[in-house]
From Swiss-Prot:
GO molecular function, one term: structural constituent of ribosome
Name of the protein described by the UniProt record: Large ribosomal subunit protein uL11
Subunit structure: Part of the ribosomal stalk of the 50S ribosomal subunit. Interacts with L10 and the large rRNA to form the base of the stalk. L10 forms an elongated spine to which L12 dimers bind in a sequential fashion forming a multimeric L10(L12)X complex.
Cysteines paired by S-S bonds: none
Length: 145
């Protein structure tokens, strides 16, 4: 018989840096999950990623207090900031541009995010990521999307 799902928790945790402190501890503790078991398995699953990369994770909790989790790709805004080499986006993206990326960097980010987006087409994924870049004040050199 299949286990009954009792909850689902979505968190954004830095790769290889999960710890029982907030936000992980309280979010899982209220569901009765073994927090250290999650921390160890999350850190092991993100071992091949660059430390500190923000990783969205969806944790499904079952009635016997066991859990499974799915790692998603880092947020587009995080990937764009990394590519442009900036700390934050622009407060006024229409007037104040804070960084530039190339079309190749845009395509790379779109290919990475493709499995989490609601499209199969790389061109549409690029348009989606370009919209995020535009709203952050990041210019894309040579892109007419």
């Amino acid at each position: 018989m299949a286990k009954k799902v009792t909850g689902q928790v979505e968190l954004m945790i830095p790769a290889q840096q999960a710890a029982p402190s907030p936000p992980v501890g309280p979010a899982l503790g209220q569901h009765g999950v073994n927090i250290m078991e999650f921390v160890k398995s999350f850190n092991a699953a993100t071992a091949n990623m660059k430390p500190g990369t923000i990783v969205p994770v969806v944790i499904t909790i079952y009635s016997d207090r066991s859990f499974t989790f799915i790692l998603k790709t880092p947020p587009a805004s995080y990937l764009l900031k990394e590519a442009a080499g900036i700390k934050t986006g622009s407060g006024d993206p229409k007037r104040n541009k804070v960084g530039k990326i190339t079309v190749n960097q845009l395509r790379e980010i779109a290919e990475m995010k493709l499995k989490d987006l609601n499209t199969e087409d790389i061109e549409m994924a690029m348009r989606t990521i370009a919209g995020t870049a535009r709203s952050m004040g990041i210019e894309i050199e040579g892109y007419k999307g």
